[in-house]
Each structure stands twice: as C-alpha cells, then as structure tokens.
Amino acid sequence: MTERKTEIYFKMLREMRDVVFSTVAADGTPRARIIDVMLVEGEKLYFLTAAGKDFYEELMRTGFVAVTGLNSNWETIRVWGKVRNVGQDLLGRIFEENPSMNNVYPGESRYILEVFCLEEGEGEFFSLGTEPIKRHPFSFGKNTYRKKGFEITDTCIGCGICASACPQQAIDEGSPYVIRQENCLHCGLCFRDCPAEAIIRRNGETDREEEAV
C-alpha cells in the first residue's frame, strides 16, 4: 500500500515526540508549550492533557491547535487544524506505548487526562538541511491547503533580475521565468526587485495535490 506524505510527516512528529503546541488564550494572546505526540494512526495525530490545565480549556473553547517540531537534520514539520476531544478510550494504549507517562500520572491519576485528535487541517514540511531548501505543503482530513509564496506572470520581460536575486537559485529561465515552489524561501526578494511588477503573491487558492511515496 502506498504511504501518503502526510502519514510520513506525522510519523516524523511522533519521532520528534516533544514538540511545540500553540493555542489562543481567552484574552486573544498566543500560548505555546511542549507536548508529547502520543500516537499516530494514518492521518490522525493524538495527544493528551489534564482537564485542569489552561491548555485543555483553550482546546475545548477554540477547537484548533498548531504544532511545530524540528529534528536533528534541520527538518521542520508544521501542522495546524481542528482538534476533537476523543475521551479516554485510548488512554490504556497510550500509556503502553509511552511508559514514562506512568511516572507522571501513576495509578488512577491518569484518569484526569483526556485524549485529543488532530485529524483535519494543513501542514508543511520544510528542510534547511539541503541545498537548496525544500518545502512541501500538505493537507489532511477533509481539508485543502492554501497556496503560498509567489509566482511569475506572463508580463515577465525576461530580464533575469529575479533569478539573480534569489538566495536559493530557485528561479528557472523561461518565458515567463518560473519559481520552483519546492525550493522557494518565500522571502519576497524577487517580488520586491522585479522591474516589470510581473511577480505576484499566490492568492491562497486551495489544492489537494499530494505525492505518494
């Protein structure tokens, strides 16, 4: 069976394990903390928290979370989307697969914990460990991802200024010139320097395209 990119990226987050989970507090300000990725099944990511924590209240109130992790190869996974409280049915399995949890919540104290599932949203793989850099947007669940960055339109005059300015050499000669989206930093140098104003921001159109490996 072919494995989708999303499944691979979720498994990478599980291997990173201790990653940053971000939410919005009741006063509208951001909050971030390190949380363990407890379980990954296909395109579903599971984590847990205690019912008395602010994190729990923020998840229940907003229904959204953003997650960021970095590994030793300078590869970042970012995901954001909807979360759902799935109760305590998975607690036993989570404690089996994460035995250190027994030291933090021994015995019956585990039942203050509730499990959440991130199952619908967007994400991006981004690697600074390669030259040029690599990025890959993806979506999971019923969601689509929004195109970001820049593109060169047909009003391109072929001067090559954008290609010379690009710090990752991610722009190929042509008519018009073409930005290799998988290698683009999204820095905006080409957008700023184009004398013909032929470079535009990608307008957020959605896409479901995703490679399988």
Report the location of each language-model feature:
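A short, Trp-centered hydrophobic/proline-enriched beta-strand micro-motif
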Residues: 11-27, 65-69
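Solvent-exposed segments in extracellular or luminal domains encompassing
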Residues: 181-184
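Short, structured beta-strand-loop surface elements
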Residues: 54-122, 128
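Ferredoxin-type iron-sulfur electron-transfer modules and their immediate structural context
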Residues: 113-115, 120, 124-165, 169, ...
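A short, well-structured catalytic beta-strand-centered motif of the EAL phosphodiesterase domain
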Residues: 35-39
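Short active-site oxyanion
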Residues: 42-46
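Iron-sulfur cluster-binding cysteine motifs and their immediate structural context
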Residues: 161-178, 189-206
